């Protein structure tokens, strides 16, 4: 009888990536098949996020539901992973003794052994350590699920912003070697992936080892990824302004595979608040980056993160944030009311902004960015946009859907053979969360470039010793 696995995922794209790797890993080692129905599962895994307020209580509420399933089926294995697991550790079992496995973001690769241990003697397992690169070494080969894919290139963060738990729950920055990343992407491209999204908590801080022992830069990596045959679009998230160096901006100037859309969190437009947040950059420095980016790529659109109601934020501070929003003309944002995360320096600050004031500021900020986003969308009306067709539209099974370079969802009439390919679509209608259009050109009519293969890149950049022996070892 087929064994079933149910994974519930909360949080960022990194968590989504981790959950997909858990599923692949347990399929490869134990033959577990994913199910959307928790009641059918032999193993239940909760992949948690600790960014938002009351994250812990949300976890225990979900576990309370699963407890009822465990009472009906004592052999059911329940595991809790992700950032709340890393933060809370044994405390989870103190409140929910029926949980069998507690694992952190860096130990998910040990899940097969943890499950075997629980199956063997029913003893609970807790492993929230930080074994650095070992996680990536032990994950199964990637499996494509459509024309787009996420690829994790690094973990952790060294920035220690005062409001953020990531350095404490995912550890400090660890970069994957460039060869490992390129090999994974080449495998995905061979399975039909056309667009990759490079992931990291601070992705542009990537400093991975190259095949010759040197340390690569993020700009170097972007160019190598762009050279992989079949990869026509590259995205990355999430970036930090302090690591957004001029060599990355140059990649926007000369690498068309890098999309004209960037998510670059700023959090506030007030230098005083940025300093309290530990962001290590000013609003002016942020705007300087955007100015350089738009000089290199005039059509680039920018999204950002904002926290409103940070301890000490005055009306003047908020007005500076609104001015920054207008100056940069952000296309979209992820914006939140400040919520103190336990164990962070900001949790010890006096939360002196009234709750109603926080809500009002958030409403004003989101309304302004929604207006700017709609203005950007209206500019696209009547233009022809290149769309990567991802599948059937959520709005109608008779239509297809895909995304523009600037991350707009576009719905249009098409044929199933277009899925996984590019089409040019004339934009005919604009809606708050999507666009509509009609196909004017298929991929066969585009004459797309023939990409350079990884082998040719390596041959061109090959380094040899005095005997003519190359340093590269495939």
Swiss-Prot record:
Pfam families: Radical_SAM (PF04055), TRAM (PF01938), UPF0004 (PF00919). Coiled coil: none annotated. HAMAP family: tRNA_metthiotr_MiaB (MF_01864). Its main location: cytoplasm. It catalyses: N(6)-dimethylallyladenosine(37) in tRNA + (sulfur carrier)-SH + AH2 + 2 S-adenosyl-L-methionine = 2-methylsulfanyl-N(6)-dimethylallyladenosine(37) in tRNA + (sulfur carrier)-H + 5'-deoxyadenosine + L-methionine + A + S-adenosyl-L-homocysteine + 2 H(+); N(6)-dimethylallyladenosine(37) in tRNA + (sulfur carrier)-SH + AH2 + S-adenosyl-L-methionine = 2-thio-N(6)-dimethylallyladenosine(37) in tRNA + (sulfur carrier)-H + 5'-deoxyadenosine + L-methionine + A + H(+); 2-thio-N(6)-dimethylallyladenosine(37) in tRNA + S-adenosyl-L-methionine = 2-methylsulfanyl-N(6)-dimethylallyladenosine(37) in tRNA + S-adenosyl-L-homocysteine + H(+). GO terms for cellular component: cytosol. Its EC number is 2.8.4.3. One of its GO terms (molecular function) is N6-isopentenyladenosine methylthiotransferase activity. Residues 378-441 form the TRAM domain. One of its GO terms (biological process) is tRNA methylthiolation. Residues 3-120 form the MTTase N-terminal domain. This is tRNA-2-methylthio-N(6)-dimethylallyladenosine synthase. The keyword Endoplasmic reticulum does not apply. The keyword Coiled coil does not apply. [4Fe-4S] cluster 1 binds at residues 12, 49, 83. SUPFAM superfamilies: Radical SAM enzymes. Monomer. It is found in: Cytoplasm. Binds 2 [4Fe-4S] clusters. One cluster is coordinated with 3 cysteines and an exchangeable S-adenosyl-L-methionine.
């Amino acid at each position: 009888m087929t064994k079933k696995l149910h994974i519930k995922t909360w949080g960022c794209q990194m968590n989504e990536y981790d959950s997909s790797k858990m599923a692949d890993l347990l399929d490869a080692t134990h033959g577990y098949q994913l199910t959307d129905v928790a009641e059918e599962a032999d193993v239940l895994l909760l992949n948690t996020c600790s960014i938002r307020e009351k994250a812990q209580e949300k976890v225990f509420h979900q576990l309370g539901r699963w407890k009822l399933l465990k009472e009906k089926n004592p052999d059911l294995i329940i595991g809790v992973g992700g950032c709340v697991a890393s933060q809370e550790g044994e405390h989870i079992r103190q409140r929910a003794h029926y949980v069998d496995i507690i694992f952190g973001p860096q130990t998910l690769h040990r899940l097969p052994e943890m499950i075997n241990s629980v199956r063997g003697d029913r003893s609970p397992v807790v492993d929230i350590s930080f074994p650095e690169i070992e996680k990536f070494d032990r994950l199964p080969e990637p499996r494509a699920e459509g024309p787009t894919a996420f690829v994790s290139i690094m973990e952790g963060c060294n920035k220690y912003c005062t409001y953020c738990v990531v350095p404490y729950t995912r550890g400090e920055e660890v970069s994957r070697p460039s060869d490992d990343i390129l090999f994974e992407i080449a495998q995905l491209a061979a399975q039909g992936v056309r667009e990759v999204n490079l992931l990291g908590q601070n992705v542009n801080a990537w400093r991975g080892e190259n095949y010759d022992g040197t340390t690569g830069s993020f700009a170097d990596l972007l160019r190598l990824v762009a050279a992989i045959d079949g990869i026509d679009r590259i995205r990355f998230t999430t970036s930090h302004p302090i690591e957004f160096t001029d060599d990355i901006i140059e990649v926007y100037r000369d690498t068309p595979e890098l999309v004209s859309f960037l998510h670059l969190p700023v959090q506030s437009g007030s230098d005083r608040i940025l300093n309290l947040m530990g962001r290590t950059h000013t609003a002016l420095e942020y705007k300087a980056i955007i100015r350089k980016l738009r000089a290199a790529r005039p059509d680039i659109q920018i999204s950002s993160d904002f926290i409103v109601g940070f301890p000490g934020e005055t009306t003047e501070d908020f007005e500076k944030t609104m001015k920054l929003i207008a100056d940069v003309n952000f296309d979209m944002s992820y914006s939140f009311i400040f919520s103190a995360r336990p164990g962070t320096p900001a949790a010890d600050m006096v939360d002196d902004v009234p709750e109603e004031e926080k809500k009002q500021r958030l409403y004003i900020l989101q309304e302004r960015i929604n207006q700017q986003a709609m203005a950007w969308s209206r500019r696209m009306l009547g233009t022809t946009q290149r769309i990567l067709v991802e599948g059937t539209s959520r709005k109608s099974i008779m239509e297809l859907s895909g995304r523009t370079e600037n991350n707009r969802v576009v719905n249009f009439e098409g044929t199933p053979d277009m899925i996984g390919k590019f089409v040019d679509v004339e934009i005919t209608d604009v809606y708050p969360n999507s666009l509509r259009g009609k196909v004017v050109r298929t991929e066969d009519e585009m004459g797309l470039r023939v990409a350079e293969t990884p082998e040719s890149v390596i041959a061109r950049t090959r380094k040899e010793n005095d005997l003519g022996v190359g340093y590269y070892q495939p």
